[in-house]
């Protein structure tokens, strides 16, 4: 039994992305970079945690909270603490990692799985926040949150599709077989 290198499979023609996928990856790159900024400067009270030593950065957060009175950020609740801790410990490092990978235009199924997991996670957590905003009739804030609901949902669908197509191509292509019998 001969084992074919996974590196050879991942670099084969089935993993070359069409132009539309490259455009989507560019959109995802800018989404992750902007979400990193939003997480650090608005969502997470990092400057308060650091004792106000970076007060110039907390101005954006103070402006947002005083202008829009976002109940997700203003009214404490245990479930919100859980969401914000996942944003700090899971999403922020992920944003940095995935942005670097997308900038290099990586065509790696591991990246696709990671973005799929993120997309499902971000969609479900934002969905919960949208329900609270809907109950409070905070329409303007809902419009701010909507891209963080729609884009992760699209990412999950897109990455799931990429993975399914690559699995079908790997299964049907003769050079893409993981194992093959040698004569």
From Swiss-Prot:
InterPro entries (UniProt xref): EXPERA, Sigma-2_receptor-like, Sigma2_recept
Lumenal topological intervals: 47-81, 132-138
Domain of life the protein comes from: Eukaryota
Record flagged with keyword Transmembrane helix: yes
Pfam families attached to this UniProt entry: EBP
Cytoplasmic face of the membrane: 1-25, 103-110, 160-183
Annotated GO CC locations: endoplasmic reticulum; endoplasmic reticulum membrane
Membrane topology per record: Multi-pass membrane protein
Cellular compartment(s): Endoplasmic reticulum membrane
Entry's transmembrane regions: 26-46, 82-102, 111-131, 139-159
GO annotation terms (biological process): protein targeting to mitochondrion
Key word Thylakoid present: no
Keywords on record: Endoplasmic reticulum, Membrane, Transmembrane, Transmembrane helix
Main location: endoplasmic reticulum
Ranges for domain EXPERA: 24-156
PANTHER family: SIGMA INTRACELLULAR RECEPTOR 2
Its biological purpose: Part of an import route for newly synthesized mitochondrial proteins termed the ER-SURF pathway (ER surface-mediated protein targeting), which retrieves mitochondrial precursor proteins from the ER surface and reroutes them to mitochondria for efficient mitochondrial import. Acts as a quality control factor in the ER, promoting the proteolytic degradation of nonproductive and extramitochondrial precursor proteins in the ER membrane thus removing them from the ER surface.
Family per record: Belongs to the TMEM97/sigma-2 receptor family.
Name of this protein: Efficient mitochondria targeting-associated protein 19
Organism: Schizosaccharomyces pombe (strain 972 / ATCC 24843)
């Amino acid at each position: 039994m001969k084992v074919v290198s996974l590196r050879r499979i991942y670099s084969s023609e089935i993993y070359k992305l069409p132009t539309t996928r490259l455009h989507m990856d560019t959109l995802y790159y800018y989404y992750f970079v902007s979400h990193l900024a939003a997480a650090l400067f608005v969502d997470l009270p990092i400057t308060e945690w650091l004792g106000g030593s970076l007060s110039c950065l907390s101005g954006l957060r103070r402006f947002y909270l005083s202008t829009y009175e976002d109940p997700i950020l203003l009214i404490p609740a245990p479930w919100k603490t859980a969401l914000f801790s996942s944003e700090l410990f899971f999403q922020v490092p992920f944003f940095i990692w995935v942005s670097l990978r997308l900038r290099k235009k990586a065509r790696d199924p591991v990246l696709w799985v990671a973005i799929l997991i993120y997309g499902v996670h971000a969609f479900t957590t934002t969905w919960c926040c949208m329900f609270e905003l809907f109950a409070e009739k905070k329409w303007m804030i809902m419009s701010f949150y909507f891209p963080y609901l729609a884009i992760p949902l699209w990412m999950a669908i897109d990455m799931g599709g990429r993975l399914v197509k690559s699995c079908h191509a790997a299964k049907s292509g003769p050079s893409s077989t993981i194992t093959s019998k040698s004569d």
